[in-house]
Amino acid sequence: MRKTFFIICFVIIAIVLNAQKRPLRPGDIYRLQAIGDPQISPEGEWVAYTVTSIDSAKDRRNTHIWMVNWNGDQTIQMTNGTESESNPKWSPDSKYLSFTATRQGSSSQIWLLDRRGGEAIKLTDIKGDLSDYEWSPDSKKIALIIKDPLDTGKNKAPKPYVINRYRFKQDVSGYLYDTRFNHLYLFDVATKKVDTLTRGIYNETNPQWSPDGSKIAFVSNQTEDPDKNSNSDIWIIDAKAGAGAKQFTTWKGSDGSPQWSPDGKSIAYLRSTSDANYIMYDQQVLAVQNSNGGEVRLLSLSLDRPVSNLKWSIDGKSIGVLVIDDMQRYVASYDVASGKMQKIVDGNRSFTSLVAHPKNGWLTSMSEPYRPSELYAIENNNLRRLTNIHSKFIDSLSLATVEKFVSKSSDGNLVSGLLYLPPNAPKEKLPLIFYIHGGPVGQDEFSFDLTRQMLAANGYAVAAVNYRGSNGRGLAYSKAIYADWGNKEVLDILGAADYLVSKGIADPNRLGISGWSYGGILTDYTIAKDTRFKAASSGAGSALQLSLYGVDQYILQLDNELGQPWKDNNYQKYLNLSYPFLHADRIKTPTQFMTGEKDFNVPSVGSEQMYQALRSLSIPTELLVYPGQYHGFTQPSFIKDRFERYYQWFDKYLKYQKM
């Protein structure tokens, strides 16, 4: 009797607690935080990291530095200024926690927090733009990457942008008209003297000290015209003024992310699979080479999956990596001697950072479908959570359920997808929105996805489709759409639609489609090929691909994948890929177009042209241009507005009152 009573009480409590939960709302973007850039202290007792939150009054994001101890039971906020701080790093002697900030009206500088206490002090007074820094092993020097300073003479009238570069546009950066370059410098912590290590017309990035502090490896493309290829190489220079850099890698593709082994005898790095000038669909491979040169060992080539975030184990016997697999991202390690891979932690989740602990184990960040990213310790291949910044908010929500599905396209291709079902979904066919990922070389994973959760919270089933062109399924799967955009991907989307309708999940009369970037491009392609969708929202998309030549930032891809339009009848390729615009009269779907005013990635002309076409054809449409926004929106109020616009548009065409 008593046991039955307790069971009844437990059920009642569970029902009450669940009833108190609520669905996501667009205004919740102001409550979500983001965790990033974890760094372990030299003795392994503390982890510094960043937390980004939203200041609703100023309509902007703020980032500050926090610490959590390795046990995960003590958390301390280290900075709390009016401006953001980022790039936390520990001095190897463990005396300081450094970070970068733009305080006191200065450009970005390095600041120090003494671990014995006290306020942060400004260490550097750099002229130019600081983009990266790295402590020397003895904590006496810091390698800096600084962009040459602007000419800021007083009372100078604005001048026209004089452009001479082949690749002259980049989102956020704008027109690449100036002749400033990122160079490597050496900063003496005691004297504050700055020595120039590299000069010239090339950019240097990613400085990494050798363990004995005598050398610095860095990445640079020093070909005749770096704008015309992706041939970045690893270079090594002695850590002293007047030294000359020596080229370490000679692969005609791209080499990057160098990491010295703990004994300094080897360098691990990431290398492209292809040595072509540019290929969108490439996979990074883990490479290891003797630090004096010699044979290159490609440890992960046979894996046929992209790897990233390489880190040496403390004993130097293995290299940890993150592996992008089908719908997940897992932690693995490669034994350097044998080349064999071992999975450390995997499952239906997504790992996004990796740091070796100085004693044993790893530090990582991980997201799951029902929880945004938190920090975790990996010990003996087991996870232990260190941070808990999301629980209070997430636990108050009734989130969509997330499950995997596999559909078959009309040509037989099998496609992995994720289905989001709204909380407390009725047992009936639902209005369903396909929200298509961008890239195209990306994928939808078992991780927390705000956009799809937000759409599901408004009563929609939401489908994510890893169409051909996505990664996580091997190089051939990614390259399947080479110079053939909007064909196989659309077959995969339509195949998923057929499957979800056949299973009684989706109402065939209430299908919608949306996406951003390549997801917006695929939205345009799909509604031009099939009229089943009753509403669409295309974000940062394009359709008249020929008109983007020299207008967007992808000149290298266009020249290498489609060719220059005036050569070899290449213009016909561009026209074939422009069918959503050239055959806009086939579109029947009411479509909303969204774009950032300053987007140089997929410029607003792509959305404007499609809006004009549908407006001319009297198809219901609207165009939303967000002032001052780039390809990725940064202003919180505009992100909230975008969700509200999704609701308004899809509700208008996909929801109806039952008779």
Predicted segments, located by residue:
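Active-site-proximal cap/loop segments of hydrolase catalytic domains
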Residues: 467-659
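Non-catalytic accessory segments flanking enzyme active sites
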Residues: 39, 143-145, 152, 170, ...
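Short loop/turn segments that connect beta-strands within beta-propeller blades
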Residues: 69-73, 114-118, 188-192, 238-242, ...
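Cap/lid segment of the alpha/beta-hydrolase catalytic domain
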Residues: 274-276, 389-509, 516, 550
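Hydrophobic beta-strand positions that form the internal "hydrophobic ladder"
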Residues: 44-47, 94-98, 142-143, 216-217, ...
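Residue-level detector of Asp-centered blade-edge/turn motifs that repeat once per structural unit
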Residues: 42-43, 92-93, 137-138, 211-212, ...
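A flexible loop/linker signature enriched in serine peptidases of the S9 family
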Residues: 51-64, 79-85, 98-111, 119, ...
